[in-house]
């Protein structure tokens, strides 16, 4: 193979979503670059069935915030199908009632609905009292209530910042502390699970209030895992990557522009599913995971490790291009 006099390696910084991919190798006027489709997804087909045995949560009480839609609805559906008595909470009572009736009919187990704005500590206190009254002390607590939207940070008002942090951080704290105190009084344990995001750890522009608040949720969960284990309570976190739900995508990708970009940076080649997340959540809240405490589980198809590695975009280089590169490297050895 005839080689050019020079090859320029231009490993630049990542371009914003929606822009043309950067050039990796310049071969004269020809760009050595390979577009890749997410064909690898065929190796990672999602399973839709329940992972745990039937009746794994028989006799258990589960409390799920944000349980009326999306991920919360998916987790509630699975827990109820496995025998749990579920209580769901959110601000929209009409949505909650419809979800509770649908899941109850589907699984044959009663699902209770309680209206609650987690930003209001008095309302949270009343909700927990009603929860205990209708179902008993919870064995499972899933903090799933969330709020988020994309915006340049310099455009955020104090109220916009407060709205997100009040729901995500303060709301999770109010629910966790109120239920925790009641469990301590009753000398009962429970498994707590919080749903955050991978950028709670890495940080991310344009969702700064959410990233900050969810990082706080993770710190709180790990701290309570250390402090309240003596009371029989476990605290774990799931960091989901992109999972297509109507609510989240309507705010974070309203035009559908970025979905292909998202898939392109996931090694498994597809978005996650609600059912997969529900299976992971159910496992972490089950007795099968009784020795898992203080864990933060990434659930992102490998997205974070791909975008974090400086040279991971070399996956787009073809075998023929690698042959060229290898020959060039051999020629320059010792120079």
UniProtKB/Swiss-Prot annotation:
One of its GO terms (cellular component) is catalytic complex. One of its GO terms (biological process) is positive regulation of cold-induced thermogenesis. Residues 1-34 form a transit peptide. It catalyses: a (2E,4E)-dienoyl-CoA + NADPH + H(+) = a 4,5-saturated-(3E)-enoyl-CoA + NADP(+); a (2E,4Z)-dienoyl-CoA + NADPH + H(+) = a 4,5-saturated-(3E)-enoyl-CoA + NADP(+); (2E,4E)-hexadienoyl-CoA + NADPH + H(+) = (3E)-hexenoyl-CoA + NADP(+). GO terms for molecular function: 2,4-dienoyl-CoA reductase (NADPH) activity; identical protein binding; NADPH binding. NADP(+) binds at residues 66-71, 91, 117, 214, 240-243. Its EC number is 1.3.1.124. The active site is at 199 (proton acceptor). It holds the Pfam family adh_short_C2. The modification Phosphothreonine is found at residue 69. The modification N6-succinyllysine is found at residues 42, 49, 73, 97, 244, 260, 319. PANTHER family: 2,4-DIENOYL-COA REDUCTASE [(3E)-ENOYL-COA-PRODUCING], MITOCHONDRIAL (PTHR43658:SF14), SHORT-CHAIN DEHYDROGENASE/REDUCTASE (PTHR43658). It is linked to 2,4-dienoyl-CoA reductase deficiency: A rare, autosomal recessive, inborn error of polyunsaturated fatty acids and lysine metabolism, resulting in mitochondrial dysfunction. Affected individuals have a severe encephalopathy with neurologic and metabolic abnormalities beginning in early infancy. Laboratory studies show increased C10:2 carnitine levels and hyperlysinemia. Belongs to the short-chain dehydrogenases/reductases (SDR) family. 2,4-dienoyl-CoA reductase subfamily. Homotetramer. This is 2,4-dienoyl-CoA reductase [(3E)-enoyl-CoA-producing], mitochondrial. It comes from Homo sapiens (Human).
């Amino acid at each position: 193979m005839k080689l050019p006099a020079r090859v320029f390696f231009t490993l630049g910084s990542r371009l914003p979503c929606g822009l043309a991919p950067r050039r990796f190798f310049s071969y004269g006027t020809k760009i050595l670059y390979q577009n890749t489709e997410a064909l690898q997804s065929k190796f990672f087909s999602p399973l839709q069935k329940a992972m745990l045995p039937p009746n794994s949560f028989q006799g258990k009480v589960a409390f799920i915030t944000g349980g009326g839609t999306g991920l919360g609805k998916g987790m509630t559906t699975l827990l109820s199908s496995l025998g749990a008595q579920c209580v769901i909470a959110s601000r929209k009572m009409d949505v909650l009632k419809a979800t509770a009736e649908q899941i109850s009919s589907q699984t044959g187990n009663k699902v209770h609905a309680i209206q609650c704005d987690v930003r209001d500590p008095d309302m949270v206190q009343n909700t927990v009292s009603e929860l205990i009254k209708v179902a008993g002390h919870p064995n499972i607590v899933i903090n799933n209530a969330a709020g988020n939207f994309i915006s340049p940070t310099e455009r955020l008002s104090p109220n916009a910042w407060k709205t997100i942090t009040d729901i995500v951080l303060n709301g999770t704290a109010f629910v966790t502390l109120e239920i925790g105190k009641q469990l301590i009084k009753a000398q009962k344990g429970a498994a707590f699970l919080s749903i955050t995001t991978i950028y709670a750890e890495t940080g991310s522009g344009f969702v700064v209030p959410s990233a900050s608040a969810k990082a706080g949720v993770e710190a709180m969960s790990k701290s309570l895992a250390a402090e309240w284990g003596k009371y029989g309570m476990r605290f774990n976190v799931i960091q989901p990557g992109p999972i297509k739900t109507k609510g989240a995508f309507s705010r974070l990708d309203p035009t559908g522009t970025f979905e292909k970009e998202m898939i392109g940076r996931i090694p498994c080649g597809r978005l996650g599913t609600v059912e997969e997340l529900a299976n992971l959540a159910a496992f972490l809240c089950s007795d099968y995971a009784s020795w898992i405490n203080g864990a933060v589980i990434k659930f992102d198809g490998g997205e974070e490790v791909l975008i974090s590695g400086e040279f991971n975009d070399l996956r787009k280089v073809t075998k023929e291009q690698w042959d060229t590169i290898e020959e060039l490297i051999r020629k320059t050895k010792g120079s």
